[in-house]
Amino acid sequence: MSVGVMSCKSTSRLHSYTDNSFTKASYKTVIQLIDEAKTYLGITYKAGGTDYRGLDCSGLVFIAFKKINISLPRKSIDMSKSGRIISFNDVRKGDLLFFKTNNKLEINHVGLVTDVDDDIKFIHTSNQLGVIISSTKEAYYAKTLVQVNRIID
């Protein structure tokens, strides 16, 4: 199944984030982050969007983290330089998954991990379906996943 993920190219830059440190927070904060992101389920895709009128992938992650008082860059490529890179085998709720979609040479898509069991699920924005939850077992995401970052430790 193809869900049509476009390269979330935002037109706005709200932060110039260069620090690669990660934020200390509790499990409760991670749950608040995921719950906030889930309030946008079903919202339509809009390039550069950061509210209920429409979101792109990095806009969704940006506003969810902002709600728990963590500032991230606005673009997925810049977000990929935040926190610390971890092994896919160490992924947990609240981590960020980064993808190179549409045969792009650089990271152009991001999702937030919502569940980790036998399957890793993440919330993100599809240009055709809006904000959805997908699985890393889906062939498209399995082949385009390139990096996992931990922001909250």
Spans of model-derived segments:
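Sec-exported extracytoplasmic/periplasmic mature domains
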Residues: 38, 42-46, 65-66, 70, ...
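Post-signal-peptide N-terminal segment of Sec-exported extracytoplasmic proteins
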Residues: 15, 23-58
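Solvent-exposed, polar/charged alpha-helical surfaces in well-ordered, non-transmembrane soluble domains
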Residues: 31, 35-39, 59-66, 92, ...
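...with weaker cross-activation on analogous glycine-rich loops/strands in unrelated enzymes
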Residues: 22-25, 70-130
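Extracytoplasmic/periplasmic, Sec-exported soluble proteins
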Residues: 25-29, 49-57, 83-89, 105, ...
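Catalytic alpha/beta core of large soluble enzyme barrels
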Residues: 129-139
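Bacterial Sec signal peptide processing site at the extreme N-terminus
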Residues: 3-26
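Short, low-complexity, Pro/Ser/Thr/Gly-rich segments in the mature regions of secreted, periplasmic
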Residues: 137, 141-152
